[in-house]
A protein has these predicted regions:
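Topology signature of small-to-medium multi-pass alpha-helical membrane proteins
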Residues: 1-138
Length: 138
């Protein structure tokens, strides 16, 4: 179980670093963050990358950083915390692909990372007998 907590700490930290830098780039330059053209947002509800950058920075970046810190401390709630932010990452990727009407290698990679985090979070919950289906049998 200790290996899973360590892996999740590193896993969430790596995702957090990418999201914090990507989100910060979109907040600093919402019209062309890291060279990404505004044309990708055509057909989406956004005129620039300010709001997506804010969501990326706060929810995905800060959220995964929080999850990494709680994994380092082996929080008894880590299964729930990792699950929430892993599912959040997968939802973020799916919504992003729908809005820009494209799928790139990084989308697939981050979706798989989110799925891996969710599976490991569920294994923690199962091991702690805190998986939602186990709560009703107590």
């Amino acid at each position: 179980m200790v290996k899973i907590y360590r892996f999740l700490a590193i896993h969430h930290f790596i995702i957090a670093i990418g999201a914090l830098f990507g989100g910060a780039a979109a907040l600093i330059n919402p019209y062309e963050p890291l060279g990404v053209p505004l044309e990708l947002l055509e057909g989406s509800p956004f005129d620039n990358y300010l709001i997506p950058g804010l969501i990326l920075f706060t929810i995905i970046g800060v959220g995964n950083l929080f999850s990494s810190c709680t994994a380092v401390k082996s929080s008894k709630h880590q299964g729930y915390i990792s699950s929430v932010f892993s599912w959040g990452l997968m939802i973020w990727i799916v919504v992003q692909c729908i809005m820009i009407n494209a799928i790139d290698f990084l989308h697939v990679l981050y979706f798989i990372l989110g799925l891996l985090g969710a599976v490991l979070a569920m294994s923690i919950l199962y091991e702690q007998r805190a998986f939602p289906t186990n709560l009703f049998g107590r």
